[in-house]
Swiss-Prot record:
Cross-referenced InterPro entries: CIAO1/Cia1, G-protein_beta_WD-40_rep, WD40/YVTN_repeat-like_dom_sf, WD40_repeat_CS, WD40_repeat_dom_sf, WD40_rpt
PROSITE patterns per the UniProt record, alphabetical: WD_REPEATS_1, WD_REPEATS_2, WD_REPEATS_REGION
Species per Swiss-Prot/TrEMBL record: Drosophila simulans (Fruit fly)
Name of protein: Probable cytosolic iron-sulfur protein assembly protein Ciao1
A biological process term (GO) from this entry: protein maturation
Residue spans of the WD repeats: 12-51, 57-96, 101-140, 146-185, 192-231, 250-289, 301-335
Length: 335
């Protein structure tokens, strides 16, 4: 069994911290929260410290932040119904664009693999796709309304322009652009959770997705493409996503976030029971019937709800978490 070793505990935000995001280089991260501020942290020697505080972009809580794949831009989603785009053009971070259109709180933001598309979602039940049109110019490419409730999370596929969204309506939906008419369509609806789906993340090649829910389970979904060897039917030549594994019994409350490490294959969860848990695929796991085991759990990782977890994209086994308790923690998993 593995261990979760606490390396750093960081404070600075006032109130609850909603989100953390690693820079693509892994030596910088951003955090956001109830205090309407974004903090940029960097590592000097063995010490993490706040290098920049961005406090003039939003009027309400900042729910989520994400770096662009190139690392030049930072997007922040806020309860003030806007998404801000920040860049460090003149040595200092500044807000270059504010994306407006959602009617209510923006809950999540995600950059596509190329950095050419941005997705946002909101309590207004919609998912928006924005095209990066040039220097600080963003154009709305699609407004998608297949969800019947608040949309909690959007995440782009790691290798294709395919978007996944998770909602209070208990479903996950997939979106792709029609090659003929260039319209964005919902291509799949994933149903198995019995309550709100809070978080989703793809594995390294995007052939599987992990989801976490208010129903206290995590689920593994697998993509079956037209002509698949398993004989899974694919109506209208669309990829079908099937739930191939449900992991239950480890979490006692809602699971608010899940992160699938692209380097190690480990899965981390952030839970409303103040815990962080790490799961690993078993050695005898089958492709169409995978099995996962919990390798370690930090039951009291934080003093209150854990809101977000994210694996470092460069440093294998390093995990960051944040919580309602106002702290950020950096952990190392030893298997």
């Amino acid at each position: 069994m593995g261990r979760l070793i606490l390396e750093h505990t960081l404070q600075g935000h006032k109130g609850r911290i909603w989100g953390v995001a690693w820079h693509p280089k892994g030596n910088v991260f951003a955090s956001c929260g109830e205090d309407k501020a974004i903090r940029i942290w960097s590592l000097t020697g063995n010490t993490w410290s706040t290098k920049t505080i961005l406090s003039d972009g939003h009027k309400r809580t900042i729910r989520e932040i994400r770096w662009s794949p190139c690392g030049q831009y930072l997007a922040s989603a806020s309860f003030d119904a806007t998404t801000a785009i920040w860049s460090k053009s003149s040595g200092e971070f500044e807000c270059n664009a504010t994306l407006e259109g959602h009617e209510n709180e923006v809950k999540s933001v995600s950059w596509s693999r190329s950095g050419g598309l941005l997705a946002t979602c909101s309590r207004d039940k919609s998912v928006w796709i924005w095209e990066v049109a040039g220097d600080d110019e963003f154009e709305c490419a699609a407004v998608l309304n297949p969800h019947t409730q608040d949309v909690k999370r959007v995440v782009w596929h790691p290798t294709k322009d395919v978007l996944a969204s998770a909602s209070y309506d208990n479903t996950i939906k997939m979106f792709a652009e029609e090659p003929i008419d260039n319209d964005w369509d919902c291509t799949a609806t994933l149903t198995s959770h019995t309550s709100t789906v809070w978080g989703i993340d793809f594995d390294a090649d995007g052939e599987r997705l992990v989801s976490c829910s208010d129903d206290t389970t995590i689920k593994i979904w697998k993509a079956y493409h037209p002509g698949n060897t398993a004989g899974v039917a694919t109506p209208e030549q669309q990829t079908v996503w099937k739930c191939v594994c449900t992991v239950s019994g480890q979490h006692s409350r809602a699971i608010y976030d899940v992160s699938w490490c692209k380097l190690t294959g480990l899965i981390a969860t952030a839970c409303g029971d103040d815990g962080i848990r790490i799961f690993k695929e078993t050695s005898d796991s089958k492709p169409d019937e995978p099995t996962f085991e919990q390798i370690t759990a930090e039951e009291g990782a934080h003093d209150q709800d854990v809101n977000s977890v994210q694996w470092n994209p460069v440093v294998a086994g390093q995990l960051i978490s944040c919580s309602d308790d106002g702290t950020i923690k950096i952990w190392k998993v030893s298997e």
